[in-house]
Amino acid sequence: IARGLAVKNPQTLLHTDAVQGFLKVPCSAKTLGADFLTISAHKIGGPKGIGALYIGPRVRNPKPLLAGGGQESGLRAGTEATAQIAGFARAVELRQENLEEKLLCMAKIRDYAAERLSAIPDLKILSAPGGAPHILSASLVGWPSQNIVNDLGSQGVCISAGSACHQG
């Protein structure tokens, strides 16, 4: 997307929501072609309600949404959540310890689950082989997703249906 956008309209700035992939898949604002990139602590075991915004060098004079003090280089009014910021930093440190080993373990669990689930009639694995190590997407034709979540939950298996940004 970034390459196509750069060719079609080089002045357009690109925002990338990297929350789900942060410290789980190799990526950077540069490799993604992102002018803005957001990440969040809660997806790596850090506190909820704290995130970070990368603003790239092509962004000239960003304007704050809320006017106020000089926090965050004048881009965000309000008291800085120092405890959450420290918690986010610690979560990053902990996540980076043995990161390759953790990612390999996640991928093995994902692959094992995909192998076991593929034996279920009418179940389709939607995730690409070798994809994100922490995501396994599957669909069971004709079954309401909430019923599957509830049935598996009653057996101690935790899954989710849809996504936080899903509407409807």
Please place each PLM-identified region on the residue numbering.
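Pyridoxal 5′-phosphate
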Residues: 1-168
